[in-house]
A protein has these predicted regions:
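Acidic active-site catalytic centers that drive phospho-/nucleotidyl reactions
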Residues: 48, 173-175, 180
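Conserved N-terminal boundary motif of the eukaryotic protein kinase catalytic domain
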Residues: 3-12
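An alpha-helical support segment within catalytic cores of ATP-dependent transferases
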Residues: 1-3, 115-174, 184-185
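Short, well-ordered coil/turn elements that cap or connect secondary structure elements
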Residues: 3-4, 57-60, 186
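Charge-rich, low-complexity amphipathic helices
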Residues: 77-78, 135-136, 179
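ATP-binding pocket architecture of kinase catalytic cores
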Residues: 11-124, 148, 166
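Conserved protein kinase catalytic/activation segment
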Residues: 180-190
Length: 190
């Protein structure tokens, strides 16, 4: 990695992505998040890195992208490190009011992320989300486990599909959930 020399590298064994994640430390004791991906994912990871820069520019509390490139292990990105606790693993230790406050804050953060326009080449939302709804409904119908009055959910979705028509296209996070959030030592949600 051209711009950084790290003296420690500790694997972070969490999450579902193929990326290998590490907490790395430089000679001055500064910590960073290092993500390493297979070289075949270069284009996708470069797009993700650039998008992270757009999100960070909105003031969203997050690991800030610092460097992107390739090295002998694949594609890497270096981001700022956030000291704190895993939100998913610790939410149950918080009061109901604290949980509500963090949930409300998560909604405000997502609203900021949705200010980013979708790429021009992305297909129309109505087509995309109707196909996605069709797929999810089909999966539910083929699943042996059913919700009591589950058809009411399907009926609701089908009755409101018209709302997808003419919607503005914005960036969709796609993986925005408590498992990808931290509560910093400063008590902020990241």
């Amino acid at each position: 990695m051209p711009q950084h020399e790290f003296i420690t590298r500790q694997l972070i064994d969490k999450g579902w992505s193929e990326d290998r994640k590490y907490c790395v430390t430089d000679e001055q004791g500064n910590k960073f998040l290092l993500r390493v991906s297979p070289i075949e994912q270069y284009d996708r990871k470069k797009s993700e890195y650039e998008l992270m820069g757009q999100v960070a520019a909105l003031g969203v509390p997050m690991c800030r992208p610092l460097e992107f490139g390739t090295f002998d292990e694949g594609v890497y990105s270096i981001q700022t490190w956030i000291d704190g606790i895993d939100a998913e693993e610790n939410i149950h230790n918080l009061t109901n009011q604290e949980q509500y406050s963090y949930g409300f804050e998560a909604g405000k953060i997502l609203k900021e992320i949705h200010k980013i326009p979708a790429p021009k080449e992305i297909e129309d939302w109505e087509i995309y989300f109707n196909r996605k709804a069709d797929h999810k409904i089909k999966m539910y119908e083929e699943c042996p486990v059913k919700y009591e009055n589950g058809q009411a959910f399907i009926d609701y979705i089908n009755a409101h599909r018209y709302l997808l028509s003419g919607r503005p296209r914005t960036y969709q996070h796609g993986d925005y959930h408590i498992g990808n959030m931290m509560i910093g030592n400063d008590k902020r949600l990241y």
